[in-house]
């Protein structure tokens, strides 16, 4: 029963009562004000996109025009240079039909411009500059390596001298003992030498004194005996002093 009633309702809906008014769609859109905002947003969106496209295309057109103008000026300059070179060649050499018949390929070649000649002349100069720069770099690297080696040698020498100075400032006990022994030996040697010198001087003085006094005393003995006695006395004194 429910299914039949639903089918009937879909085929023949119930009539709308007279008191209910049909709502106007335009009035509702105006009341909500949502349709107007959406439409204005879409309109301005398309306008902005169109303006951006126009400016982008205008910049592209301007760049193309500049390129065309530059290419036109370059072609005009090339043509003028070619014409001037042809005129110079025609002035330098007179026209000979036999030469043109013999050498048609040479006439077909385009004349050389000044820019091409400048490029050809600049190529060896560029090569020389590159070689010079490479040579300078190699010399600089060698100089840097030499300076580093010299600096390392200086640092090593400074380190060794610093170690030696430290060892001198802080001597070991063995070195102290050695120094003391050497000083003692030196002192003993100097004392012995001074004693020897003093004894020798005393012996000489005594000999002089004895010789002086022996000359003053009168003696009956002949001079040969006196000399022998003096020599024996001097030898005895020297022996005593040497034993002492």
Curated annotation (Swiss-Prot):
Spell out the subcellular localization from the entry.
Membrane
Q: How does it sit in the membrane?
A: Single-pass membrane protein
- This protein's GO CC annotations: membrane
Record keywords, A-Z: Membrane, Transmembrane, Transmembrane helix
Q: Does the keyword ATP-binding apply?
A: no
Primary subcellular site in the record, as a coarse category? membrane
Q: Where is the composition biased (Polar residues)?
A: 96-114, 132-142
Highest taxon above the source species: Eukaryota
Q: Name one Pfam family in it.
A: DUF4636
What InterPro entries does the annotation carry? DUF4636 (IPR027955)
Keyword Iron-sulfur assigned to the entry: answer is no
Biased-composition ranges, Basic and acidic residues, are 80-94, 161-176
Residues passing through the membrane, by range: 35-55
Q: What are the start and end residues of every segment in region (Disordered)?
A: 65-114, 126-191, 210-244
Q: State what protein this is by name.
A: Serine-rich single-pass membrane protein 1
Gene name, Swiss-Prot/TrEMBL: SSMEM1
């Amino acid at each position: 029963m429910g299914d039949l009633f639903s089918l009937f309702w879909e085929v023949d809906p119930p009539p709308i009562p007279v008191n209910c008014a049909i709502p106007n769609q335009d009035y509702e859109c105006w009341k909500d004000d949502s349709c107007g905002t959406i439409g204005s947003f879409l309109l301005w969106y398309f306008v902005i996109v169109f303006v951006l496209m126009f400016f982008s295309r205008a910049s592209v057109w301007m760049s193309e025009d500049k390129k065309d103008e530059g290419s036109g000026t370059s072609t005009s300059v090339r043509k003028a240079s070619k014409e001037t070179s042809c005129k110079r060649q025609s002035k330098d050499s007179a026209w000979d039909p036999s030469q043109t018949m013999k050498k048609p390929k040479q006439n077909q070649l385009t004349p050389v411009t000044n820019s091409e000649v400048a490029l050809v002349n600049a190529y060896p100069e560029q090569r020389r500059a590159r070689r010079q720069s490479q040579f300078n770099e190699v010399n600089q690297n060698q100089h840097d390596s030499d300076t580093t080696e010299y600096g390392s040698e200086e640092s090593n020498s400074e380190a060794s001298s610093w170690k030696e100075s430290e060892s001198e400032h802080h001597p070991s006990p063995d070195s102290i003992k050695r120094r003391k022994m050497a000083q003692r030996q030196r002192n003993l040697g100097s004392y012995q030498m001074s004693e020897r010198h003093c004894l020798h001087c005393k012996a000489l003085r005594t000999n002089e004194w004895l010789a002086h006094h022996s000359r003053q005393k009168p003696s009956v003995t002949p001079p040969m005996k006196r000399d022998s006695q003096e020599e024996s006395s001097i030898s005895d004194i020297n022996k005593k002093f040497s034993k002492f």
